[in-house]
Every structure is written in structure tokens, then in C-alpha cells.
Amino acid sequence: MTLFFQIEYTVRPGELLHVLLSGSYPDGQQWSYNLPMTTADGQHWSLATTVLSQHFRSRRAGRQKTDMLSFGYHYQVEDAEGRVLRREWTVVARRCECRADSRLRFADRWRDVPVTAHL
């Protein structure tokens, strides 16, 4: 399984954009990954990863190999020490369901907190 993430978002020097993936096994145990993205110009970011492939192949702790996997993801800006500086709006989650042989491309836009979110 390969996931391709692309997003256009301008950051300040020293800031990095990350994509956070999260989900859970059928038994309720949760998993998550914080993956740094790469950029050549500080504005166009990308990441190709196979990190979720292990959830299809492994039988860790007696878990059965799964045919389908559901996960959510969002983006955040971090400094060089890993402190979160900005996080996109996550009230409406980005969710995906996929198979082990999936090759998915996510061409996203940053989702700011709406001005009326406090209402």
C-alpha cells in the first residue's frame, strides 16, 4: 500500500509540515504516525509512504491480518523541536478506507478554522 500526500501551504523558515495518520484495530487499540513532509520551496509539500502496509501484513499480538483499513489524517506545522505551531481544522475529519493493494493520492488544501467556528 502506498499513500501519496500533496499540499500547498507556505511556512516560515525553520517550520516543517507534517501529516498525522491515525486509526484503530477492530479490538479498539489505536495507532498513529506523525510523518514529516518534504519541500523544495517551503510552499509545495509532498510525502510518499508505505507505513500503513504493516497493518495488512502483521499478526502482532494475535491480531488477524486485515483486508481493509480505515484511517484519518490531518496536517500540522511543527518547529525543529517538534512543537506544534499550527494545526488545520479537524472538526470535519479526513477519512479513508483502503485495501492492501491500494495506491492512493491525496491532493489537499489546508483547512483553516472557520471564522464562525466559535458560534
List the model feature ranges, each with a label:
Residues S102-L119:
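Compositionally biased low-complexity segments at domain edges in trafficked proteins
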Residues F4, D27-G28, T116:
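Intrinsically disordered, low-complexity regions enriched for glutamine and histidine
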Residues T10-M68, Q76-S102:
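Aromatic-rich carbohydrate-binding modules that target alpha-glucans
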Residues T2-E8:
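A short, amphipathic beta-strand motif
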